[in-house]
Amino acid sequence: MKISQAVGNACTVPASSVETHNNNPSKESKIIYLPGTNCEIKSQALLSAFTSYRVGGAAELYVAPRNIEALQASLRYAQEHNLRVTTLGAGSNLLVSDRGISGLVIATRHLRYTHFDHQTGQVTIAAGESIPSLAWEIAKLGWQGFEWAVGIPGTVGGAVVMNAGAHNSCIADILVSAQVLSPDGTVETLTPEELGYAYRTSLLQGSNRVVTQATFQLQPGFDPAYVTATTKQHKQMRLTTQPYNFPSCGSVFRNPKPYSAGWLIEQSGLKGYQIGGAQVAHLHANFIVNRGGAKANDIFCLIRHIQQEVQERWSILLEPEVKMLGEFQAA
């Protein structure tokens, strides 16, 4: 079994937010109940509702556990049936193929809890918690160290896996440990050193382990008004420099030191360049936005076009930061 990271009642598949999509008319949508839990797995669940690009096909199987026991049961099911597993957080750094994803998609968005230790200044957060919401909550307590993360549109699990960062700060700077779950149900607690952090990556990417929670070291005891004001400054900076009026995945490419990917793309004359409904943003060239009606393959083809143009002009091959899942068709 291979796992891709991307990231109360045991688990739920909300009828209001999960649509079904049958890529193959011979396949029927069905619900699988996992023994010993209230957990149910749904087939042919459309993933566009769960990605920030608002594109993508269906998951062959989809489940959203609400606790560790349900997550373990889901992983056991995948292992027993030799299914590929993809972990889905907020879907904010993800491009899902129009053809969908085979195997089991496990959404961690319902793994939600936060514990503040006011003596040590440490906070333990479940994988499904929203990074921006946490940044505001932490600021209102007067704790410093998380202000920079307010503009990161993801969940804790995904942020830990990719070492998310902004404003010259990143997850590795504040992480104490991450709890991860192996396919056999084994729970491990890993330090930043054991995670092998580097720029926007960790050893968890492409591994067979799922982040369940993380503990961060912050600095309590500051004026909440001051920390909140600093957090607002970080948010405002992102609002004025990055496009939020159309769906996107955030930064598409990693910055190839010493250059900025956005600068290379802009200098290649690609701002505003469009394929189908996908466009290089005018405000920030390292963003590709869905102008409306875009297909995942439009975005994929635009990514490839940008890579070709930048490499031809600058002899630099831009490396995508966005994770692409499924099969795509080059133009």
From Swiss-Prot:
EC number: 1.3.1.98
Active site: residue positions: 200, 251 (proton donor), 321
Segment forming the signal sequence: none
Gene Ontology molecular functions: FAD binding; UDP-N-acetylmuramate dehydrogenase activity
Glycoprotein keyword on record: no
Cellular component annotations (GO), alphabetically ordered: cytosol
Domain FAD-binding PCMH-type: 54-221
Entry-linked InterPro entries: FAD-bd_PCMH (IPR016166), FAD-bd_PCMH-like_sf (IPR036318), FAD-bd_PCMH_sub1 (IPR016167), FAD-bd_PCMH_sub2 (IPR016169), MurB (IPR003170), MurB_C (IPR011601), MurB_C_sf (IPR036635), Oxid_FAD_bind_N (IPR006094)
Catalytic activity: UDP-N-acetyl-alpha-D-muramate + NADP(+) = UDP-N-acetyl-3-O-(1-carboxyvinyl)-alpha-D-glucosamine + NADPH + H(+)
Keywords, ordered alphabetically: Cell cycle, Cell division, Cell shape, Cell wall biogenesis/degradation, Cytoplasm, FAD, Flavoprotein, NADP, Oxidoreductase, Peptidoglycan synthesis
Pathway of action: Cell wall biogenesis; peptidoglycan biosynthesis
Subcellular location as annotated: Cytoplasm
Pfam families: FAD_binding_4 (PF01565), MurB_C (PF02873)
Cofactor(s) named in the record: FAD
Domain of life: Bacteria
Similarity field: Belongs to the MurB family.
HAMAP family the record matches: MurB
Protein name: UDP-N-acetylenolpyruvoylglucosamine reductase
Organism, scientific name: Nostoc sp. (strain PCC 7120 / SAG 25.82 / UTEX 2576)
